[in-house]
Swiss-Prot record:
Belongs to the PTH family. It is found in: Cytoplasm. Monomer. The record marks D87 as: Stabilizes the basic form of H active site to accept a proton. Hydrolyzes ribosome-free peptidyl-tRNAs (with 1 or more amino acids incorporated), which drop off the ribosome during protein synthesis, or as a result of ribosome stalling. This is Peptidyl-tRNA hydrolase. The record marks N9 as: Discriminates between blocked and unblocked aminoacyl-tRNA.
């Protein structure tokens, strides 16, 4: 079983914010897939299954406690692989990077996952840039002129993610799909 986690915050006030690009990518995948909804309160998030071996998770614990949801799903399904999609303020909007393991880079959602599940998982890092005030920047909505770039990056990321799921070769996917901005 492969678990793909899209990080974000629940609630209308957080929709279309920079911190929610992980949720946005999961939603994009669900739009184009036949899925089974496995959402259950014990998973502390929205959980979907595509095919026989792919789980998509949107934690409902808020960003800083994402690990609670990830651990609940991972413990129940005994996933062989985990891929986490998240915003990254250290790379510009329009950029895309891939990584396995390492530090959380100050990202509280990753810190929570690392604490409860370890850090040996693949990461899809979607650049959102760094504003003057980090918190208001990541919790802020994309400007209209940024939405075109965001849409292109999400489509590109979707292709990369689907290939990563199939091929399990992070280095090759990184070489093929990483974007600079």
């Amino acid at each position: 079983m492969i678990l793909v986690v899209g990080l974000g915050n629940i609630g209308v006030e957080y929709e279309n914010t920079r911190h929610n690009v992980g949720f946005m990518l999961i939603d994009l995948l669900l739009k184009e897939s036949n899925f089974t909804n496995l959402t259950n309160s014990k998973f502390k998030g929205e959980l979907f299954k595509i095919g026989s071996s792919l789980l998509l998770l949107k934690p409902s614990t808020y960003m800083n406690n994402s690990g609670l949801s990830v651990k609940a799903v991972n413990d129940f399904y005994k996933c062989e692989r985990m891929i986490v999609i998240h915003d990254d303020i250290d790379i510009n909007l329009g950029a895309l990077r891939f990584k396995k393991g390492g530090s959380s880079g100050g990202h509280n959602g990753l810190k929570s996952i690392d604490t409860l599940c370890g850090n040996d998982y693949e990461r899809v890092r979607i650049g959102v840039g760094k504003g003057e005030n980090v918190i208001s920047h990541v919790l802020g909505k994309f400007k209209s002129e940024e939405e075109i770039t965001l849409s292109k990056v999400l489509e590109h990321t979707k292709k990369a993610l689907l290939e990563l799921i199939e091929n399990d070769d992070l280095s090759a996917i990184s070489s093929k799909y990483s974007l600079k901005a």
